[in-house]
Each structure stands twice: as structure tokens, then as C-alpha cells.
Amino acid sequence: PLKTPKKMLPKIHLLKNEKIHKTLPKHNNSISKYDKGHVVVIGGVMSGAARIVAYASRKVGAGLSTILVKPNHLKYYTKCEPGTIIAEYSDKQLLKKDVLVIGPGLGKDYDKSFIKKIILEFDGKIIIDADAISIFENKKKEIHQLIKKKKSLILTPHRGEFKRIFKPSENKIVDCFNAS
């Protein structure tokens, strides 16, 4: 009989419960939300993005999630999901948090030096996305220094953000997409 070429085989596979349960962390019965980590999101004018991040972080295992915003942005967060803490930004609010997510829904009205200060001073794991990535546009050297300084840093640029920061040739980007 003829065999199906590998290129034609499905790239989607059924994920079964047995496999899922093997990858999930095991917790004892005495664990509480305070033991599972606290994610802080710096929110902005587009509240939906920050709210999704806060909600999703709890869904994947964080015990607590907080969205910190400027006082004039609090009005965008009046009807947040139960379980999401909304607070006015202060440096003190960043203490004892495990993960910082900065960028989703931030908007362009934040002071760039203020955002950089938050990133540089935060001691935990950091995810930089969207508008916080755009702060480093045309600052390739600065982003490289940040990557070297912060060992637990994840950048999530889309293609346009990546091009604005790193200025790769179009051929290199196409090669990466083809390789993936």
C-alpha cells in the first residue's frame, strides 16, 4: 500500500488527559493562592488586554493577579473579572510580586522612562509585550543590554515590532518563518 507523505500528515494532535495530567504541577492539599505566585500587570487605556492577561495568568496557575494602573485609568477597570485585583500604581505595589507583565493594553500615553524604570527595578520574571516593546524602537543596543541584565526576561514582539527594534533584512525574517 501507498504511504501518506509526511507533508500531508495532520499537524494537529489530540491532547489526552493522561498527557495533560503528567505536565501539570502536583500540589498538596494545604497549598493556597498565596503559595502559587502573584502576577502583576501594568494596565493602560485598553483594559481588555490587561484583563485577559490577569485572568489567563490565574487560569494557568498563578494564585493571584493584580492590574496596576494610573489613577486616570482606573475608570476603565470598573467591571473586572472576580479574582483580579485592581489598584493604583505605586512602586510599593511591585514588591513581593513574582512576575511582571508590561505592555498589553498599555497605550502610548505612558512616559517611556517610567516604563523602563519599572522594568529595570523589578526583581522577578518579566514579560514585555506590545506597547512596552515599542519603547525600544530604534534602540537595539538598549534592548540588548536589558536582555543581558535581566536573566528572566521574555520579549513577545510581533513581526512589525521585531523589525522596528532589530532591523533585520526581510530575507532573514522570511527564512525564520519558513523554518518554523
Task: Report the location of each language-model feature.
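Small-residue (G/A/S/T)-rich helix-start motifs and N-terminal tracts that mark the onset
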Residues: P1-I127, S134-S180
